[in-house]
C-alpha cells in the first residue's frame, strides 16, 4: 500500500489481499455507504455483512481458482483515498486477471464510504 494511505485503508487492502473477508468487514463502519460497479452490474450494500457478501462474490467463486491478489499503489485526493488490488486466477474459460480500484473515506476510524470500480476479467496468456 502507498505511504499516503491511512491505517484503516491499508488494513482494508491487506484484508482483501489475504482474502480475509471477516477482517475486511470488521473495518467497515456500521453505517457504511457502499456502491460498486463491475462491467455488468451496479452493486449496493446496506451494512458490513452485505459488503462482505459482495467481496466474497468477487473473490471466492467456487468455480475459480484465485492464484494471487496483490495490492497496487494508491493515492490521496483531498479526504478520499484511492487503493487497489489486482487479481489473477483460473476459471472455466482459462486464466484471467482483473483490477479493482477502491475510493475510501474514513468515519470514526473505520471505512465509512466506499466506492469500488472493477476492470472486468481479462484473459491471460492466449486464453
Each model region followed by its residue ranges:
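Short, low-complexity N-terminal intrinsically disordered segments enriched in polar/charged residues
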Residues: 1-30, 125-127
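Short non-domain terminal segments
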Residues: 10, 19, 32, 94-96, ...
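Alpha-helix C-capping/helix-to-loop hinge sites
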Residues: 15, 35, 89-90
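A solvent-exposed, acidic/Ser-Thr-rich amphipathic alpha-helical stretch
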Residues: 23, 29-74
Amino acid at each position: 500500500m502507498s505511504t499516503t494511505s491511512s491505517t484503516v485503508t491499508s488494513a482494508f487492502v491487506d484484508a482483501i489481499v489475504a482474502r480475509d473477508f471477516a477482517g475486511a468487514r470488521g473495518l467497515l463502519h456500521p453505517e457504511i455507504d457502499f456502491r460498486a460497479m463491475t462491467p455488468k452490474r451496479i452493486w449496493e450494500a446496506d451494512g458490513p455483512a452485505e459488503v462482505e457478501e459482495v467481496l466474497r462474490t468477487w473473490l471466492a467463486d467456487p468455480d475459480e481458482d484465485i492464484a494471487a491478489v496483490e495490492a497496487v499503489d494508491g493515492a490521496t485526493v483531498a479526504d478520499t483515498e484511492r487503493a487497489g488490488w489486482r487479481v489473477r486466477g483460473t476459471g472455466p474459460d482459462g486464466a484471467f486477471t482483473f483490477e479493482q480500484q477502491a475510493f475510501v473515506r474514513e468515519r470514526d476510524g473505520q471505512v465509512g464510504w466506499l466506492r469500488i470500480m472493477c476492470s472486468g476479467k481479462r484473459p491471460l496468456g492466449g486464453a
